[in-house]
């Protein structure tokens, strides 16, 4: 194997859900491994959670054994994981992987994470009068302590330092969460960090994108069916059975998990109590899970593709073509040759 070359760029592989990123990443790691060891950094907000294997399409133990993987199974579903934490972890891992003489390969579909890594993290969002009006209306009906309880679910760090009646600060924290999807505490962590700690990170970006959207839609449907057959419902039932999780948590808002949780809630309301772990979901509920889960996943894929198309510097491979993986591998090798001594 060639000696490590620090001039080689970090490689990023992005794409919509069900585009075949995991298989492509493993093939790419095998090809690159002939010249330099490769380690994969996951860029996926669902894969960070333990106990969420089926619905997140988590790489199998065999796949993770074939190539070192990072940022998988690093959080309990009760915990949040922000874009700021991802950037901090990814930058640290890139340095550690480089120090081992290996090449970082960042793979995933959480575009907020990629954006934060490539561009640096945005400043805290500005106030939104419409969001504030909705929060004020809820507070008038439920009281600020109720909204403080909600804040504790999505941003426990901020909630812990605020009194239940601190309406102004509770409103701002929930406003930031609703606008950005990130807890207020994550922005404070950025502001307190060392200069440049969360700046942009240079990567050569490659993407897998379908030429035919119907091809991806069909793959999404088939994969969701495979998840259901593999025990996805039981996986969510086991998470519910813990008793400390709820649907407002970031982990439980992941596509697929939200739809299964909602179906189980519906069955609990209409069938005399919550289903026990392993109990079958009624046919009506199963139909709803499939319909809503597939639709939500397709919407996610649409948003991912829209984000990718805003990145003109990417190298795109058509993932719905027969030789897609081989073409991707060749494109990455050519890019690395440009940096070879």
From Swiss-Prot:
<feature type="site" description="Interaction with substrate tRNA">
    <location>
        <position position="110"/>
    </location>
</feature>
<feature type="region of interest" description="Interaction with substrate tRNA">
    <location>
        <begin position="253"/>
        <end position="258"/>
    </location>
</feature>
<dbReference type="InterPro" id="IPR018022">
    <property type="entry name" value="IPT"/>
</dbReference>
<protein>
    <recommendedName>
        <fullName>tRNA dimethylallyltransferase</fullName>
        <ecNumber>2.5.1.75</ecNumber>
    </recommendedName>
</protein>
<keyword id="KW-0460">Magnesium</keyword>
<keyword id="KW-0819">tRNA processing</keyword>
<feature type="binding site">
    <location>
        <begin position="15"/>
        <end position="22"/>
    </location>
    <ligand>
        <name>ATP</name>
    </ligand>
</feature>
<dbReference type="InterPro" id="IPR039657">
    <property type="entry name" value="Dimethylallyltransferase"/>
</dbReference>
<dbReference type="GO" id="GO:0052381">
    <property type="term" value="F:tRNA dimethylallyltransferase activity"/>
</dbReference>
<dbReference type="GO" id="GO:0006400">
    <property type="term" value="P:tRNA modification"/>
</dbReference>
<dbReference type="GO" id="GO:0005524">
    <property type="term" value="F:ATP binding"/>
</dbReference>
<feature type="region of interest" description="Interaction with substrate tRNA">
    <location>
        <begin position="302"/>
        <end position="309"/>
    </location>
</feature>
<keyword id="KW-0547">Nucleotide-binding</keyword>
<dbReference type="Pfam" id="PF01715">
    <property type="entry name" value="IPPT"/>
</dbReference>
<comment type="subunit">
    <text>Monomer.</text>
</comment>
<comment type="function">
    <text>Catalyzes the transfer of a dimethylallyl group onto the adenine at position 37 in tRNAs that read codons beginning with uridine, leading to the formation of N6-(dimethylallyl)adenosine (i(6)A).</text>
</comment>
<keyword id="KW-0808">Transferase</keyword>
<comment type="similarity">
    <text>Belongs to the IPP transferase family.</text>
</comment>
<feature type="region of interest" description="Interaction with substrate tRNA">
    <location>
        <begin position="168"/>
        <end position="172"/>
    </location>
</feature>
<feature type="region of interest" description="Interaction with substrate tRNA">
    <location>
        <begin position="44"/>
        <end position="47"/>
    </location>
</feature>
<feature type="binding site">
    <location>
        <begin position="17"/>
        <end position="22"/>
    </location>
    <ligand>
        <name>substrate</name>
    </ligand>
</feature>
<dbReference type="InterPro" id="IPR027417">
    <property type="entry name" value="P-loop_NTPase"/>
</dbReference>
<keyword id="KW-0067">ATP-binding</keyword>
<feature type="site" description="Interaction with substrate tRNA">
    <location>
        <position position="132"/>
    </location>
</feature>
